[in-house]
From Swiss-Prot:
Biased composition (Polar residues): 453-469
Single Gene Ontology BP annotation: ascospore formation
Reactions this protein catalyses: L-lysyl(36)-[histone H3] + 3 S-adenosyl-L-methionine = N(6),N(6),N(6)-trimethyl-L-lysyl(36)-[histone H3] + 3 S-adenosyl-L-homocysteine + 3 H(+)
Upper taxonomic lineage: Eukaryota, Fungi, Dikarya, Ascomycota, Saccharomycotina
Protein name in the entry: Histone-lysine N-methyltransferase, H3 lysine-36 specific
Functional note: Histone methyltransferase that trimethylates histone H3 'Lys-36' forming H3K36me3. Involved in transcription elongation as well as in transcription repression.
UniProt source species: Yarrowia lipolytica (strain CLIB 122 / E 150)
Gene: set-2
Entry keyword Transcription: yes
Top EC class of this enzyme: transferase
Pfam families, A to Z: AWS (PF17907), Med26 (PF08711), SET (PF00856), SRI (PF08236), WW (PF00397)
Compositional bias segments (type: Basic and acidic residues): 411-452, 555-568, 682-734, 755-768
Length: 768
């Protein structure tokens, strides 16, 4: 039974005395399993890594971690990884009690959620001959309770003399827990997990009949209504299936069919499993990693081979497909633990190779890390011509692939700009520009070339980023003069805002689309939000009469200035002139637009009311999603505000805005927040590494130096103010709230594209 609530007839023992200390005297406690030489191997060539990003929720149950989904614990993972329960001994709160007929039992001292890790089954991992010897010894000694658990074929965990508290977990015919086998590093380990919600005071149990012990049958005292009366022994296959719930789902058969196979009434070859779905992929891949029986492996591989859905095949590849297939091929033609005959080995190998042919070949990363090339290479000399031919074809195709290299992560800068986020980030860059990224190595956000953060027409090409930054001027939602509704629904005031005092010489002002004033200097080719400060050269001063003739020093200064201007490349001059003309034209068009727009009418009020309602509705969902990311409180509040406003604007454009958040829309909102916050976190990580001008090399620095030198020659002291303003801007635009990305200037946009071609990121999302 599964669900959030325990059944009404749950057996509770709230008043039973805690006898943990007494129970610990009956055996030697081990912190972890001990292994006989050569036992407990997970058959993994190397430790498998996931592609989760660092953060407080990394690799948790909602992260989609490929390791967690396939019952693999992360080993070399990021800080904050939530998938290290065996390694961290993150056990549930339990104690030991004394039962009436079953001896000691394990009791929950706090509520345990469904799926939660309860305890590891710790003991001595022994081989089959040792298992038989100890069984005889324990029988001679009159041991009433056996503590054998099968780890994998031919290997057992014996917790009789040495073990952990998990040994006291009793059998039940209606258990609230179950056993799972997990890969931890290069070892296979076993843990007890909650199958449903377990109440405080309830005994933790699981079904012993799922795992073979080889002991004599014993009477069952579980007290459940469906109790079969005994456990263990040779007759256990007749009382219950020995296949776990995870393996049942992986096989794609009904429990009735599985029982028929176990009893020999049906053959697995005569049954057709269900079509493989994306939801079952993780169970199939997790089960394939364990050394199952031959008929089980055949059924699971058959489900994969018969599947024609590309999304399912992509999921199989993502869930460590190359590594698991390499493991199966190695075992099939090596020690052959499955006991396959020659015909079965050929069939299994052909199935695997033909599946590998279906998979998209983008980069060589997963192929190389799985070491499957060496395995396939050994098959090129196989006696079966079909196997040899397909193996050679795969090797030839893989040889043409390129490796992709991950850009090192940068630490978060606590003093960095909280609103400036890279417009496009790339986790990996291939050696060849013609090769695209591997879809399963990096989470890719789909691109919409026609949409910016507000749904307006903007492209993210280098030419766009080098245009006037007015295109990306953000609007702080906290500004009282900003409109409360969407830009197109509520008209801006007809009269633009004006600066409160006179501007310094050379400075002009204009209004952005929201009516907010910004300042620009055509001569210096800069623009900013802050009111410009007057430089000494432009400050008014008392006339002191006509200037006298220049001396030799003044003439030399003029000559240097003239030479500096002559040395300036024509391309830079033409680019500057083009930028100035563009700035002037945009400012003129914006001023005409503001003057031509009528004042807000009464018809805007319903839109404002609608926007207010949507804001309240979305504010109940968005902050909870944002809080999952590792950002400070103020930054989280600001990002939540921005995201809510963006989503409100989008909803108001629809004929019928939503009145409530359905499960489907909640899922899409979650994806939107994930993409938005991913950019925020990535930008913060880059700033932590001190890369304030990403991709600017020596050539870019020399170009900056030449420009600054030329400006000093032409403008003297006034350039210091310009450099100061420009420096503040390049540092992070502290006054600029985040919308679509950083406010790129000409130089940063130009140099950033020289090193890395960043993917375009679409912040547009369809909530319908």
């Amino acid at each position: 039974m599964s669900g959030n609530n325990s059944p009404i007839n749950a057996q509770l023992f709230p008043d039973a005395r805690d006898v943990t200390k007494d129970a610990l005297q009956t055996f030697v406690e081990l912190p972890e399993c001990t292994y006989m030489k050569g036992l407990g191997s997970s058959q993994q060539a190397e430790v498998m890594a996931c592609d989760c990003k660092p953060g407080p929720t990394a690799c948790d149950e909602d992260s989609g971690c490929i390791n967690r989904l396939t019952s693999i614990e992360c080993v070399r993972c990021c800080k904050g990884c939530q998938n290290k329960r065996f390694q961290g001994k993150k056990y549930a709160s339990v104690d030991v009690i004394s039962t009436e007929k079953k001896g000691f039992g394990l009791r929950a001292t706090k509520d345990i959620a469904a799926g939660e890790f309860v305890y590891e089954y710790v003991g001595e991992v022994i081989d089959e001959p040792t298992f038989k010897e100890r069984t005889a010894i324990y029988t001679t000694q009159g041991v009433k309770h056996f503590y054998f658990m099968m780890l994998q074929k031919g290997e057992f965990i014996d917790a009789t003399a040495k073990g952990g508290l998990g040994r006291f977990c009793n059998h039940s015919c209606a258990p609230n827990g179950h056993v799972e086998k997990w890969v931890v590093g290069k070892r296979l380990r076993m843990g007890i997990f909650a199958s449903r919600h377990i109440q405080r005071g309830e005994e933790v149990t699981f079904d012993y009949n799922v795992d073979r012990y080889g002991a004599e049958a014993q009477a069952c005292y579980c007290g459940e209504k469906n109790c079969v009366g005994f456990l263990g022994g040779k007759t256990q296959t007749e009382s219950a299936s020995k296949v776990s719930g995870t393996l049942t789902a992986a096989l794609g058969l009904t429990s009735r069919d599985i029982n028929a196979i176990l009893r020999g009434k049906k053959s697995a070859e005569d049954l057709r499993p269900r079509d493989l779905t994306v939801q079952d992929v993780s169970k199939v891949m997790a089960s394939l990693m364990m050394n199952q029986e031959a008929w089980q492996v055949n059924l699971m591989l058959q489900r994969i081979a018969l599947c024609t859905d590309t999304s399912v095949q992509a999921a199989v590849m993502k869930m460590h497909g190359y590594q698991i297939f390499a493991q199966i091929l190695t075992a099939t033609w090596g020690d052959n633990p499955l006991g396959l005959d020659d015909s079965d080995r050929v069939n299994v190998t052909l199935m695997l190779l033909r599946v590998l042919q279906k998979w998209p070949r983008i980069t060589k990363n997963k192929i190389s890390s799985s070491q499957i090339e060496n395995v396939v290479k050994s098959l090129t000399s196989n006696d079966n011509s079909d196997i040899a031919t397909i193996a050679q074809e795969l090797l030839s195709e893989w040889a043409n692939l390129k490796m992709a290299f991950r850009i090192p992560r940068r630490k978060i800068d606590p003093d960095g700009d909280e609103h400036s986020v890279s417009r496009g980030t790339s986790e990996e860059v291939t050696k060849e520009s013609s090769k695209s990224e591997e879809p399963n190595d990096v989470e890719v956000v789909k691109v919409n070339k026609k949409a910016d953060n507000n749904g307006n027409g903007v492209t993210d090409s280098p030419s766009t980023r080098s245009e006037s930054p007015f295109t990306f001027i953000p609007t702080p939602y906290s500004n009282k003069t900003a409109p409360k509704g969407p830009k197109k629904a509520v008209k801006q005031p007809a009269s633009p805002m004006v600066p409160p005092r006179s501007l310094p010489k050379g400075w002009q002002f204009a209004n952005d689309p929201q009516g907010k004033v910004y300042y620009y200097n055509l001569e210096l080719n800069i623009q900013q939000w802050d009111f410009p400060k007057a430089s000494r050269a432009s400050s008014p001063s008392t006339p002191k009469g006509p200037k006298g003739p220049k001396g030799p020093r003044g003439n030399r200064r003029d000559e240097r200035r003239d030479n500096s201007e002559t040395r300036e490349p024509l391309s830079l001059q033409s680019q500057r002139e083009s930028d100035l003309q563009r700035i002037i034209e945009q400012a003129r068009l914006q001023e005409v637009k503001n003057n031509s727009e009528p004042a807000p009418s009464a018809s805007a009020k319903p839109v404002n009311a609608q926007a207010h309602r949507l804001t309240k509705l979305l504010a109940k969902v968005v902050p909870n999603q944002v809080s999952k990311y590792d950002v400070d409180r103020e930054r989280a509040k600001k990002c939540s505000k921005d995201i809510v406003q963006i989503l409100v604007d989008k909803e108001l454009k629809r004929p019928e805005p939503m009145t409530e958040i359905s499960d489907e829309k909640a899922k899409k909102i979650k994806e939107f927040v994930k993409g938005y916050m991913g950019k925020v976190v990535k930008r913060l990580e880059e700033k932590e590494g001190g890369a304030k001008d990403f991709g600017r090399g020596r050539q870019g620095n020399r170009r900056d130096s030449e420009r600054q030198s030329d400006r000093r020659g032409r403008q003297g002291q006034s350039d210091r103010d310009h450099s100061d303003n420009h420096g503040r801007k390049r540092k992070g635009e502290e006054n600029q709230p985040y919308e679509a990305g950083p406010m790129y200037d000409d130089e940063s946009a130009e140099t950033s594209t020289e090193t890395v071609k960043k993917p375009k990121v679409d912040m547009e999302i369809d909530l319908e």
